[in-house]
Amino acid sequence: MFSEPVKRIYDSQGAYYFQSSEAIRRLEGAIVKYTDLVESRDVADLELSGVVGGVVKVLDRLDQLVSETPPIPGPRRYGNMACRDWHEKIEREIPGLLEDLISSHFPSELQCVVELRYYLANSFGSATRLDFGTGHELSFLATVAALDMLGASFDGDQVLYIFDRYYSLVHRLILSYTLEPAGSHGVWGLDDHFHLAYILGSSQWCNRKKLAMEPNDLSDPVLVEQYSRTNIFCKTLNFVFTVKSGAFREHSPMLFDISRSVRTWAKVRKGLWKMYKDEVLNKFPVIQHFWFGTGFYPWVDYKNGKPLPNYENSPDIDETNDLKTQAQANMDGTRVVESRFLSPGNETFVRRPQLPQDSGVGTMRSSTPESRLMNVTTRSTRSTAGPGQGRMGPPTSMGIVQTRMPSSTTSQAHASRLMNTPRQ
């Protein structure tokens, strides 16, 4: 049931189909579950054992490899080339590390390593671009959620410990190898590298009987540093204060605005979650690097389990992030481009019409983000409007070849562990 993950998202059409996938349902379900589990908790020392101990052992080994791979001396503007050596080392070691972890705790699921190794290896930035961003952070979430689907059943303290250890390692990677932001919006983005960390950290402050820190205290670097050891929001913001100079309002205006305009942590969490769905899960530049297997994150419709449309643009096509841009290049508003539709064991070339300028498919923002509730059981509320009925309308008919995929009954059983685990 497990298979080598493959690329399915090649343009914003693929990003549109991703919104209907079982994969995004599981990822969103994991975020909702973990934000609930960590609510009102601090990062605390744990007696490491079981799956948690195994995960931390893997992260410790990857951290040790950083020590064994020092940065190359000399000024570097776009990342240190030693990072590529580090990535080569982890590519060699991760399969064995995961086999030890899975064989110790889930021996009957050893075949899952073929998928799990992809998500873990992609959790630490790009060896090609020497950068790190929210897509890599998403890959680590996918790794943790995959272990949860196998039966790890993490509680809130364990979730916090694992993510805190992960962020410590990533902070070291960014500083050691001067990793660039991946797809950053600059000062107009939430953060150069992270987003999920702020959701988890804000949830830690929610519903406390005695609140040690209010949102308006975020502009106090001394207080932020004080709580950076127990709160992931403060840990991440303290990292920002470490790597950036100047006024808070100038280098991180969005975080500064949160500290000035949002009064409660519950509202901070709600706003960050809504923003995450729009700016991470719904953005082609981010999710194009998320690949799909047949076990943990299958490329199938979450409603009926059928395979989603699957195609790849020809290499000679000038790919853009926005199909509307391509349409505007044509005098009549349409043109025909060549796409390769893929199915197992069969590749055919098909002519399809390019989307017209008014097709409504542009940057992939939901027309009704409020309807995308934080409960994964309500995913049927997603917009199914047709062309011209909102920005999330499906693209015009393209004669897409529907491919058949193997049944994933076991995969659904794994997913049910993730979705239905009660709050600890």
UniProtKB/Swiss-Prot annotation:
Q: Which Pfam families match?
A: PTPA
Question: Which controlled-vocabulary keywords does the entry list?
Answer: Cytoplasm, Isomerase, Nucleus, Rotamase
Region Disordered, as annotated, extends over 348-424
Top-level EC class as recorded in UniProt:
isomerase
Q: Where in the cell is it found?
A: Cytoplasm; Nucleus
Q: Which GO terms describe its cellular component?
A: chromatin; cytoplasm; nucleus; protein phosphatase type 2A complex
Q: Which domain of life is it from?
A: Eukaryota
- Residue ranges annotated as coiled coil are none
Gene Ontology molecular function: peptidyl-prolyl cis-trans isomerase activity; protein tyrosine phosphatase activator activity
Q: Which family does it belong to?
A: Belongs to the PTPA-type PPIase family.
Q: What does this protein do?
A: PPIases accelerate the folding of proteins. It catalyzes the cis-trans isomerization of proline imidic peptide bonds in oligopeptides. Acts as a regulatory subunit for PP2A-like phosphatases modulating their activity or substrate specificity, probably by inducing a conformational change in the catalytic subunit, a direct target of the PPIase. Can reactivate inactive phosphatase PP2A-phosphatase methylesterase complexes (PP2Ai) in presence of ATP and Mg(2+) by dissociating the inactive form from the complex.
One Gene Ontology biological process: mitotic spindle organization
UniProt-recorded name of the protein: Serine/threonine-protein phosphatase 2A activator 1
> What is the organism field in this record?
Candida glabrata (strain ATCC 2001 / BCRC 20586 / JCM 3761 / NBRC 0622 / NRRL Y-65 / CBS 138)
Q: Where is the composition biased (Polar residues)?
A: 364-386, 404-424
The EC number on file is: 5.2.1.8
Which reaction is the catalytic activity of this chain? [protein]-peptidylproline (omega=180) = [protein]-peptidylproline (omega=0)
Primary localisation category: cytoplasm
Q: Does the keyword Cytoplasm apply?
A: yes
